[in-house]
């Protein structure tokens, strides 16, 4: 059984999520201890528990310690349940997108349909529009197709969002994402839920004002939804290059003007573009698992503490040679033995 110190590196939920993903894919059981030991509220929190339960559902896993506050977890996966329909209700505004990140690598070619309820646009996790505009499109570039339907949006603290994931298929091998290539255009989605529509327009206009200096076509659509359970707003942007995609997002919050939300996302996007990387700082972390599973290389915007943590967990589960160089940007290469 693989032993993992949960206080290693950044010591957060990323260690657990990466371990769950790779455990289900490889069939290797693990025990993680000192879970979130260095955090103000140590142990498993509700959002982490749902990642455990989601992966338990798809792999018929045996678990010990899967309860709120637990500082130790044993996870023993069995065969993945293909050709199945799974419903996951995180409750309130637990992050749907973090659950998606954990599950998607494990359900490739498994003919599964997964419905997740919770928070689609919440702090400290990618927004659902970033997932749709950037994450899924990068996966498509490396050879993984999928269908993701956003049924309802969910914001903090009420949640109420709903997403359906299905038809995750592909057979990527030894891919290469080393540059963005010529910048073609900027795409985006500016949204509001149960708030005035002008907020979405102001977010969009603010972002466009900053991005106009890039000299390319800008297409930011607005998504206005009234009658949702939770109130909120946000914007996600994607810089479409000839060879890759760079993304950024920002969420509204009480007291934060719509113009600031749009400006924040636009400046994040430009900051990532200035690194001359092929993928942005968030995708740099998320692409590491796929590269290690299928072989390949990419240039990411910045080597974060999450990335270091991911690398160490990957080495515990996979027989793979990892080469890494640089910091901002950095190059990650994985060769499968």
Curated annotation (Swiss-Prot):
Residues reported to bind ATP: 101, 282-285
Pfam family, one: RTC
Enzyme Commission identifier(s): 6.5.1.4
Top-level enzyme category: ligase
Keyword Cell division recorded: no
Gene3D superfamilies, sorted: RNA 3'-terminal phosphate cyclase domain (3.65.10.20), RNA 3'-terminal phosphate cyclase, insert domain (3.30.360.20)
UniProt-annotated catalytic positions: 306
GO-annotated biological processes: RNA processing
Alphabetized CDD domains for the sequence: RNA_Cyclase_Class_II
Reaction catalysis annotation: a 3'-end 3'-phospho-ribonucleotide-RNA + ATP = a 3'-end 2',3'-cyclophospho-ribonucleotide-RNA + AMP + diphosphate
InterPro entries: RNA3'-term_phos_cycl_insert (IPR013791), RNA3'_phos_cyclase_dom (IPR023797), RNA3'_phos_cyclase_dom_sf (IPR037136), RNA3'_term_phos_cyc (IPR000228), RNA3'_term_phos_cyc_type_1 (IPR017770), RNA3'_term_phos_cycl-like_CS (IPR020719), RNA3'P_cycl/enolpyr_Trfase_a/b (IPR013792), RPTC_insert (IPR036553)
Keywords attached to this entry: ATP-binding, Cytoplasm, Ligase, Nucleotide-binding
Localization (cell): Cytoplasm
Broad class of the protein's primary localization: cytoplasm
One Gene Ontology cellular component: cytoplasm
GO MF annotation list: ATP binding; RNA-3'-phosphate cyclase activity
Function: Catalyzes the conversion of 3'-phosphate to a 2',3'-cyclic phosphodiester at the end of RNA. The mechanism of action of the enzyme occurs in 3 steps: (A) adenylation of the enzyme by ATP; (B) transfer of adenylate to an RNA-N3'P to produce RNA-N3'PP5'A; (C) and attack of the adjacent 2'-hydroxyl on the 3'-phosphorus in the diester linkage to produce the cyclic end product. The biological role of this enzyme is unknown but it is likely to function in some aspects of cellular RNA processing.
Protein family membership: Belongs to the RNA 3'-terminal cyclase family. Type 1 subfamily.
Name of the molecule in the record: RNA 3'-terminal phosphate cyclase
Organism: Saccharolobus solfataricus (strain ATCC 35092 / DSM 1617 / JCM 11322 / P2) (Sulfolobus solfataricus)
């Amino acid at each position: 059984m693989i032993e993992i110190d949960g206080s290693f590196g950044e010591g957060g939920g990323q260690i657990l999520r990466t371990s769950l993903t790779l455990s289900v894919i490889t069939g290797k059981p693990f025990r993680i201890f000192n879970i979130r030991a260095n955090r103000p509220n140590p142990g498993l929190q509700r959002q982490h528990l749902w990642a455990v339960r989601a992966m338990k559902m798809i792999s018929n896993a045996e678990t010990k310690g899967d309860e709120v506050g637990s500082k130790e977890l044993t996870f023993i996966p069995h065969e993945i349940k293909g050709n199945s329909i799974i419903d996951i209700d995180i409750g309130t505004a637990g992050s749907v997108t973090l659950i998606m990140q954990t599950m998607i690598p494990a359900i490739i070619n498994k003919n599964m349909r997964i419905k997740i309820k919770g928070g689609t646009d919440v702090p400290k996790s990618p927004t659902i529009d970033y997932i749709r505009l950037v994450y899924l499109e990068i996966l498509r570039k490396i050879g993984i197709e999928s269908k993701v339907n956003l049924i309802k949006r969910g914001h903090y603290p009420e949640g109420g969002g709903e997403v359906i994931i299905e038809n995750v298929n592909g057979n990527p091998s030894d891919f290469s994402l080393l540059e963005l290539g010529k910048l073609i255009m900027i795409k985006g989605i500016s949204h509001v839920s149960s708030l005035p529509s002008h907020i979405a327009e102001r977010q969009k206009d603010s972002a466009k004002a900053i991005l106009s200096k890039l000299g390319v076509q800008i297409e930011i659509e607005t998504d206005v939804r009234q009658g949702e359970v939770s109130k909120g707003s946000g914007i996600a942007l994607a810089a479409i290059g000839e060879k890759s995609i760079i993304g950024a997002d920002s969420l509204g919050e009480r007291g934060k003007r719509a113009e600031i939300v749009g400006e924040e996302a636009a400046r994040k996007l430009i900051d990532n573009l200035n690194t001359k990387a092929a993928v942005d700082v968030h995708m740099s972390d998320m692409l590491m698992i796929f590269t290690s599973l299928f072989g390949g290389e990419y240039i990411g915007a910045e080597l974060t503490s999450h990335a270091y943590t991911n690398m160490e967990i990957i080495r515990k589960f996979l027989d793979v040679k990892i080469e890494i160089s640089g910091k901002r940007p950095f190059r990650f290469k994985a060769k499968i033995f």
